[in-house]
């Protein structure tokens, strides 16, 4: 809403953004400079764990951003990567997860395990979203 965008999905390869009354199909196609990896972060001062992950994936820079909007800007191709330690609940991620994954993003834990829902306490494990396997192209 802050940027006058609405995101929605209704299944694999069917994620969309409505902006300025125009519907755009999302496919995670990179819209930033090739050869560089741009990440979103939940904080302006990421933890040492997250900084290590950003370094491991050769992230060029990161931008702090709140809410599941982070998932959506990866689906648009405006950013390439997001990593988060254990901190949120399933309902905090579910809608953004659906939009990003159905646009082609790869979503897992930081340990590259499948991200699961339906846990007894609803607490999320760590999270990693990659625009695709080749982040800088």
Model regions and ranges:
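Oxyanion/phosphate-interacting regions
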Residues: 48-56, 70-137
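Acidic beta-strand-loop-alpha-helix segment within the catalytic core
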Residues: 1-71, 124-137
């Amino acid at each position: 809403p802050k940027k006058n965008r609405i995101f929605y999905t209704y299944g694999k390869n069917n994620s969309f953004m409505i902006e300025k009354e125009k519907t755009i199909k999302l496919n995670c196609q990179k819209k930033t400079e090739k050869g560089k990896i741009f990440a979103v972060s939940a904080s302006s001062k990421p933890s040492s764990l997250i900084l290590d992950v950003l370094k491991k994936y050769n992230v060029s820079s990161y931008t702090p951003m709140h809410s599941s909007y982070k998932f959506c800007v990866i689906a648009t191709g405006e950013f390439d990567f997001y990593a988060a330690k254990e901190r949120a609940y399933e309902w905090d991620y579910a809608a953004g997860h659906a939009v990003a994954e159905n646009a082609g993003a790869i979503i897992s834990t930081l340990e590259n395990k499948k991200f699961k829902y339906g846990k007894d306490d609803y607490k999320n494990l760590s999270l990693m979203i990659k625009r695709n396997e080749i982040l800088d192209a």
